[in-house]
Curated annotation (Swiss-Prot):
Protein's UniProt name: Arginine--tRNA ligase
Gene name as annotated: argS
Cited SUPFAM superfamilies: Anticodon-binding domain of a subclass of class I aminoacyl-tRNA synthetases (SSF47323), Arginyl-tRNA synthetase (ArgRS), N-terminal 'additional' domain (SSF55190), Nucleotidylyl transferase (SSF52374)
Oligomeric and partner information: Monomer.
Catalysed transformations (reactions): tRNA(Arg) + L-arginine + ATP = L-arginyl-tRNA(Arg) + AMP + diphosphate
Coiled-coil ranges from the UniProt annotation: none
Length: 561
């Protein structure tokens, strides 16, 4: 049911309860029964109140039902009610209540499922790869999840900023530079003098070739970097290689249809003095101590659940990796982002408590749950029943660009979103390429394209279809489809609240299934002109909501296939 219908029904149930138990203050929840034959919605309010009221739950449920059905306002929504099991109340809607979604979608169009704007902003950080190689399938999952979460928050009225954090300071950048230098000197990955921690992908040879050619490269947010071609200048090689790979990652993101609002460089935390100031503040606040020549943070005393204190500055003088993370998240807070979400691999699980502890130690009034985290598990790529592990381009892993070239951007986005982030996922290339009902992307996009074709072949214009009488829509499969469409705004709300875009993917698959079921059960282009127009209006309504849902995942609503 529509959100406004849901709130109205909850208020009607509360009024019915108040007539029986004036002192009660129930938390009334409505759910869709797992079995459609049991009704349109169900509530356990009678079971919730029975014990404190010292009443039999079924008798109390009957009293609530009697009071509800005696209310004229309720009869406009509720057609019938029954008591099930220990005291569940199952409700069935009137035809008019079920048909209301058609008018709602006609009025709201692309805004159906979207909330009013709110004066709140959120920063979502995701992908955040080291500039040491092409983006891999794990980054692709982050890109799909992160962009969908951004779209969900935008639909929920938030001001959303997408941010990419470049880990451009550390040993991995040095390893990149010496790898390119070795290639420039004609040393291959199989040679005994190849660096022990060197990167071996073909892209290293490409960087070396362009460096020797004194090429110029520029990342999306940076200044052009001109190669000198001097193979002895490791710093020049490093700067060129980082810029080269940042540009390559920009191209990967462009192919994915993803544009970031801001790029933040880890190196800037050091050059600006943020890391030093963060450490000095933690020392001044009394949350550190020295032991064995190292500086430790008392994370176990800062209330974020860390199980042991953590080294901040090693005995040889370098900072551990979580220290710049604390400085970075303080920078987020100071930029006015009091809501922040990080999309990262599950291997970052151990950093959550220590980063939050560091932020608590700064005593800036930052909430303990800042930032929020979505930690995803990795992806296994399968083709022909075998795991695909190697990419010629990357040398040791399948890249984001590989996936896009193999199956297309839409399939990559949907497949990487359709499971909970915290579950392992097998990306089946053969399934993603198949034109069958088993392929969810094909199944959903085909539903949208079929509706476009149906409406075009009807010869009716949009105005005629929009004016059709939805009261003619009374077939069981039509009621089922309309109920599914009415759920969409609440699914969007749930997906945003739980940072879980897979709810949208599930809903799209279910909606496509309901549409195909209706299409197969009821002829649309019938001789009865009024019924034909009403069914075309339902089809157009379905097309609009499917398009709205696909847009939240960044997937194309195809008009023909």
């Amino acid at each position: 049911m529509l959100p406004e219908q849901q709130q109205h029904l909850i208020s009607l149930l509360a009024r019915a309860v108040a007539g029986i138990l004036p002192e009660a203050s129930p938390d009334i929840l409505l759910e869709r029964p797992k079995v459609a034959a049991h009704g349109d919605v169900a509530t356990n309010v009678a079971m919730q109140l029975a014990k404190p009221a010292k009443r039999n739950p079924r008798e109390l449920a009957q009293g609530i039902v009697d009071a509800l059905l005696a209310d004229p306002q309720a009869r406009a929504i509720v057609d019938s009610a029954e008591i099930a099991g220990p005291g569940f109340i199952n409700l069935r809607f009137t035809a008019q209540a079920r048909q209301a979604v058609v008018a709602a979608v006609s009025a709201q169009g692309a805004a159906f499922g979207r909330a009013a704007r709110r004066d709140e902003k959120v920063l979502v950080e995701f992908v955040s790869a080291n500039p040491t190689g092409p983006l891999h399938v794990g980054h692709a999952r982050q890109a799909a999840l992160g962009d969908a979460i951004c779209r969900l928050f935008d639909a929920s009225g938030w001001d959303v900023t997408r941010e990419f954090y470049y880990n451009d300071a550390g040993n991995q950048i040095q390893n990149l530079a010496i790898s390119v230098q070795a290639r420039a000197r004609g040393i291959g990955p199989d040679a005994p003098e190849w660096p022990a921690d060197g990167y071996k992908g073909d892209y290293i040879a490409d960087i070396a070739r362009d460096y020797l050619a004194q090429a110029s490269v520029q990342a999306a947010d940076g200044e052009p970097v001109q190669a000198s071609g001097n193979i002895d200048d490791l710093e020049d090689i490093r700067a060129f290689a980082v810029a080269y790979l940042r540009r390559e990652q920009d191209l990967d993101l462009q192919a994915f249809g993803l544009k970031f609002d801001n790029f933040f460089l880890e190196s800037s935390l050091y050059t600006s003095g943020r890391v030093e100031r963060t450490v000095e503040t933690l020392i001044a606040k009394g949350h550190t101590y020295e032991q064995d020549g190292a500086l430790w943070l008392r994370t176990t005393e800062l209330g974020t659940g860390d199980d042991k204190d953590r080294v901040m500055r090693k005995s040889e003088g370098g900072y551990t990796y979580f220290v710049p993370d604390v400085a970075y998240h303080l920078a987020k807070w100071e930029r006015g982002f009091h809501h922040a979400i990080n999309i990262q691999g599950s291997d970052h699980h151990g950093t959550v408590a220590r980063v939050r502890a560091g932020l608590q130690g700064l005593e800036e009034g930052i909430p303990k749950e800042f930032p929020a985290y979505v930690l995803h598990k990795m992806v296994k790529v399968m083709r022909g029943g075998e795991e695909v592990k190697i990419s010629k381009r990357a040398g040791s892993y399948v890249t984001m660009r590989d996936l896009i070239e193999w199956v297309g951007r839409d399939a990559v986005r949907y497949f990487l979103i359709q499971r909970r982030a915290d579950t392992e996922f097998v990306f089946d290339i053969d399934l993603a390429l198949s034109k069958s009902d088993e392929n969810p992307v094909y199944y959903i996009q085909y539903a949208h394209a079929r509706i476009c074709s149906m409406i075009a072949s009807s010869g009716l214009d949009d105005a005629t279809i929009a004016a059709a009488d939805a009261a003619r829509l009374t077939a069981p499969s039509e009621f089922a489809l309309m109920q599914r469409l009415a759920e969409f705004p609440n699914v969007v709300k749930l997906a945003a609240q739980e940072l879980a875009p897979h709810h949208i993917a599930f809903w799209l698959r279910d909606c496509a299934s309901d549409f195909h079921g209706w299409y197969n059960a009821e002829r649309v282009l019938v001789d009865d002109e009024g019924l034909k127009q009403a069914r075309l209006r339902l089809a157009a309504t379905t097309r609009q909501v499917l398009a709205n849902g696909l847009a939240l995942l960044g997937v194309t609503a195809l008009e023909r296939m």
